[in-house]
Design a protein with these regions (language model features):
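Basic, helix-initiating cap at the start of DNA-binding domains
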Residues: 1-38, 42-45, 54-62
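N-terminal intrinsically disordered/low-complexity leader segments
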Residues: 1-13, 73, 183-194, 225-239
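Alpha-helical structural segments
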Residues: 17-24, 59-75, 84-91, 118, ...
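Hydrophobic alpha-helical connector segments
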Residues: 73-118, 134-137, 141-144
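Hydrophobic alpha-helical bundle segments that form small-molecule/ligand-binding pockets
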Residues: 119-170, 187, 217-220
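C-terminal lobe substrate-recognition/regulatory segment of protein kinase catalytic domains
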Residues: 166-200
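A hydrophobic membrane-anchoring alpha-helix module
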Residues: 198-230
Length: 239
C-alpha cells in the first residue's frame, strides 16, 4: 500500500512574522522597494491577508522599527551611568548598521513607536539614576540627539564611493580657494570596515563625538551635584 506523504504545514501568519519579513525584505532590496504587495509575495499570501496584522504601510514601518529597536542590548546591571549609556548606544548603532534603512524611517516618523518610547524611557532612567536632575537630563537628551539611537545627521553625505583619482582632482581644486576644507577632505583614510567615503572612519568619528559628549555630561553632573542644596560643598560655602 502506497504511503501517503503529508504536505508540509504552512506556518500561520502573525504580526511578528509579517514584521520580521518586512525587515528582511527592506534589508535585501531597500526600503524604497518595500510594498504590501511585495511583502505578501514574499510570505506567499494575498495582500489582503497582511491587513489583518498591520492596518497599512505606515503601521508596518512602525512595527519594523520596533523589531530593530528590539535588537538593542538591555541595560547592563551594576555599571555606572556613563558605561551603561555608552554600551546601549553602541548596541543601537550595531542594530542600525545591520539595517541601514532604519535611521531614515525613524526620522520620518511623526510619533515614536512603543518600543522606541520604552528605549528612550530606559535611557532617561539611566541618567536620572546616575544623579542627573530633570533639567540636566532634558538638556543632555537634546545634546545627544539621534546619537542615542546610534546614528547622526551629517552636514554632507559622503557615503557614496568616489573614484580616488577624481577625489584627488576635487581636493586640488578646493585647495585653490578653500585650503582648510581641502586639508580635511584630503586627510588619509582610516582602516577598518566602517570607513565611509575616502577620508572618514564613521565608527571612530561616532565614538569620538559620543565620548566627548559623555565626558561633558559627567562634568555638568558633578557641578550640579556639588552645587545642589544640601550638598557638602554648598553647606561649607554657606558657613
Amino acid at each position: 500500500m502506497a504511503q501517503q506523504i503529508e504536505a508540509p504545514r504552512r506556518v500561520p501568519l502573525s504580526r511578528g512574522r509579517v514584521l520580521r519579513a518586512g525587515v528582511a525584505l527592506a534589508d535585501s532590496t531597500g526600503i524604497e522597494s518595500l510594498s504590501m504587495r511585495k511583502l505578501a509575495e514574499e510570505l506567499g499570501v494575498v495582500p489582503m491577508a497582511l491587513y489583518k496584522h498591520v492596518g497599512n504601510k505606515e503601521e508596518l514601518l512602525d512595527g519594523m522599527i520596533d523589531v530593530v529597536v528590539g535588537e538593542i542590548d538591555p541595560p547592563v546591571r551594576g555599571t555606572d551611568w556613563k558605561s551603561a549609556i555608552r554600551q546601549r548606544i553602541l548596541s543601537a548603532r550595531r542594530a542600525l548598521l545591520r539595517h541601514p534603512w532604519a535611521s531614515h524611517v525613524i526620522e520620518s516618523r511623526t510619533n515614536p513607536t512603543p518600543d522606541l518610547l520604552e528605549y528612550l524611557d530606559s535611557m532617561i532612567g539611566i541618567f536620572r539614576a546616575g544623579g542627573f536632575s530633570i533639567d540636566l537630563t532634558h538638556h543632555v537628551m537634546h545634546a545627544i540627539g539621534s546619537r542615542l539611537l546610534g546614528f547622526t545627521q551629517e552636514l554632507f553625505d559622503d557615503s557614496q564611493s568616489v573614484d580616488p583619482e577624481m577625489q584627488a582632482i576635487v581636493v586640488r581644486e578646493l585647495a585653490k580657494k578653500y585650503p582648510y576644507v581641502a586639508e580635511i577632505a584630503g586627510a588619509a583614510s582610516h582602516e577598518g570596515e566602517s570607513v565611509v567615503g575616502q577620508g572618514c572612519d564613521d565608527q571612530f568619528e561616532f565614538e569620538f563625538a559620543l565620548d566627548l559628549l559623555l565626558d561633558g555630561f559627567e562634568r555638568l553632573r558633578h557641578q550640579e551635584l556639588t552645587h545642589r542644596p544640601g550638598s557638602q560643598r554648598t553647606q561649607q560655602a554657606s558657613r
